[in-house]
């Protein structure tokens, strides 16, 4: 499971 959280 891959979680990507952008900081913008």
UniProtKB/Swiss-Prot annotation:
One of the record's GO molecular function terms: hormone activity
Residues recorded with modification Tryptophan amide: 8
Cellular location(s): Secreted
Keywords of the record: Amidation, Flight, Hormone, Neuropeptide, Pyrrolidone carboxylic acid, Secreted
GO cellular component, one term: extracellular region
Bridged cysteine pairs (disulfide): none
Example GO biological process: neuropeptide signaling pathway
Residues modified to Pyrrolidone carboxylic acid: 1
Function: This hormone, released from cells in the corpora cardiaca, causes release of diglycerides from the fat body and stimulation of muscles to use these diglycerides as an energy source during energy-demanding processes.
Family: Belongs to the AKH/HRTH/RPCH family.
Name of the protein: Adipokinetic hormone
Species in which this protein is naturally found: Striatophasma naukluftense
């Amino acid at each position: 499971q891959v979680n990507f959280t952008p900081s913008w």
